[in-house]
Structure formats: C-alpha cells, structure tokens
C-alpha cells in the first residue's frame, strides 16, 4: 500500500469571524495556541501529512475570513474541496445561527457533483469557557446536525487541545472518501460528454 500515490485533500473551514478557525488549524498542525491571532484577511492555508487507513495523505486546510463579503475569493477557492468544516462558538448564538448560511454558501460556490452526500463536519469550539457562559447546548447542536443528514459533530477547544485531533481524524477520513468517489466518477465524466458532442456533430452534418 505504501507504493500508492500520495493524495492531497482540500478542506475548507468556514464560520463567523472569531469562532476560532485559525486557532483550531494551528492547534492541529503546529500543536500551538495563541490568544493574539490577527483576523484572517482573505484566505490562508496550512498543511499536515497524515496516515488515513494506511493511505499517506496531505491535508490542505483552508482558513477563511469570517465575513459575509468574502465572495471575492471566488469560486476557485471552493472548487475541488473534499470536505467542509463548519465552526461555531458554543458561547455565541449568532455564530451557531449562521451555520446554515455558511453551508448554503459553500454548496452554491463549490457546486459539488453530489451535494446531498458531500461531507460536512461541524465543530462547536471554545468549550473551555465556563459552563455558565455557554449558550448553545450539545443537544441543540446535535439536533441541527441530524437535520442536515447526520453531519458528524465535535465539541472542541483549540486552547486546551480538546477533541481537535479526533475531529480532524474524521475530517481526513471523510475527505479521503470524497476524493476517492470523485476520482471514480471522473473516470466516466469526460467520455460521456465527448459522446454527446460527437452526436451533435453528426446531426449537424
């Protein structure tokens, strides 16, 4: 299996500004946490080599500015994604309410071949904050995920490295499954299109 080619997995991380997207990425890739990250401008990415079911893969994690007007990044930013991670702050109801619009935005821009089965993962971040300040319960978050077809849900703390590794293991596994299904589908896509074009040419003659 070691002779199989390496795979690049593109993972898009979406969510409101301040929910901890950059912190989660840095905790996962660099095992570091800083309380003084500057707001991400546009988009940035980090990579990490991981082993998923005996496959050597490179995770390319894309962090975005959590602003509604970053469509200027364009379709190219979303296209080719193998998994989308939706992040909210369990202490901020607005960031939770925005998950639907982030999910819709991704599906519109990325235009995955099979949107109903495209892999999403939801992360409820900042669980290190004292329980009394928490506003989004585990039950409420899980209900949302179930309503969207059973999206995997993890409660994380980038600050204390809680569940970060476990969440990204599932993200990597789901992204790899998506990448492999896209490769399989792609084997048939071009011949079908060429056949249609040839038929049209024949009719024109």
Swiss-Prot record:
Record bears the keyword Transcription: no
Primary site of residence: other
Sites bearing Cysteine methyl ester, chain numbering: 205
Gene3D superfamilies reported in the protein's UniProt record: P-loop containing nucleotide triphosphate hydrolases
Gene Ontology molecular function terms on file: GTP binding; GTPase activity
Location within or outside the cell: Vacuole
List of residues binding GTP: 17-23, 33-40, 66, 125-128, 157-159
Pfam families: Ras (PF00071)
Motif stretch (Effector region): 37-45
Lipidated positions per record (S-geranylgeranyl cysteine): 203, 205
Disruption phenotype: Exhibits defects in mycelial growth and production of conidia, and consequently fails to cause disease in rice and barley. Shows impairment in autophagy, breached cell wall integrity, and higher sensitivity to both calcium and heavy metal stress.
Gene Ontology terms: cellular component: fungal-type vacuole membrane; late endosome
Keywords of this entry: GTP-binding, Lipoprotein, Methylation, Nucleotide-binding, Prenylation, Vacuole
Keyword Repeat: no
InterPro entries in alphabetical order: P-loop_NTPase (IPR027417), Small_GTP-bd (IPR005225), Small_GTPase (IPR001806)
Description of how activity is regulated: Rab activation is generally mediated by a guanine exchange factor (GEF), while inactivation through hydrolysis of bound GTP is catalyzed by a GTPase activating protein (GAP).
GO biological processes: regulation of vacuole fusion, non-autophagic
Subunit record text: Interacts with the Rab GDP dissociation inhibitor GDI1.
UniProt function note: Ypt/Rab-type GTPases are key regulators of membrane trafficking and intracellular vesicular transport. They act as molecular switches that convert between GTP-bound and GDP-bound states, and regulate virtually all steps of membrane traffic from the formation of the transport vesicle at the donor membrane to its fusion at the target membrane. In the GDP-bound state, Ypt proteins are predominantly cytosolic, solubilized through the interaction with a GDP dissociation inhibitor (GDI).
Similarity field: Belongs to the small GTPase superfamily. Rab family.
Name of the protein: Ypt/Rab-type GTPase ypt7
Organism: Pyricularia oryzae (strain 70-15 / ATCC MYA-4617 / FGSC 8958)
Gene symbol of the encoding locus: YPT7
């Amino acid at each position: 299996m070691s002779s199989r080619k390496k795979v690049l997995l593109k993972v898009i991380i979406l969510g409101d500004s301040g929910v901890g997207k950059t912190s989660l990425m840095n905790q996962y890739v660099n095992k570091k946490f800083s309380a003084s990250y500057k707001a991400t401008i546009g988009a940035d990415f980090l990579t990490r080599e991981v082993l998923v079911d005996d496959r050597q893969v490179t995770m390319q994690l894309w962090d975005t500015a959590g602003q509604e007007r970053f469509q200027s990044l364009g379709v190219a930013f979303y296209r080719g994604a193998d998994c989308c991670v939706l992040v909210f702050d369990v202490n901020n109801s607005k960031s939770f309410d925005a998950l639907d619009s982030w999910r819709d935005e991704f599906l519109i821009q990325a235009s995955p071949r099979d949107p109903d089965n495209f892999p999403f993962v939801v992360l409820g971040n900042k669980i290190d904050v004292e329980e009394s300040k928490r506003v989004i319960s585990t039950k409420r978050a899980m209900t949302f995920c179930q309503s969207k077809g059973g999206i995997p849900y993890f409660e994380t703390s980038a600050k204390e490295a809680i569940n970060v590794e476990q969440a990204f293991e599932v993200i990597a596994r789901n992204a790899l499954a998506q990448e492999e299904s896209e490769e399989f589908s792609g084997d048939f896509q071009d011949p079908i299109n060429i056949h249609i074009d040839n038929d049209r040419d024949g009719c024109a003659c």
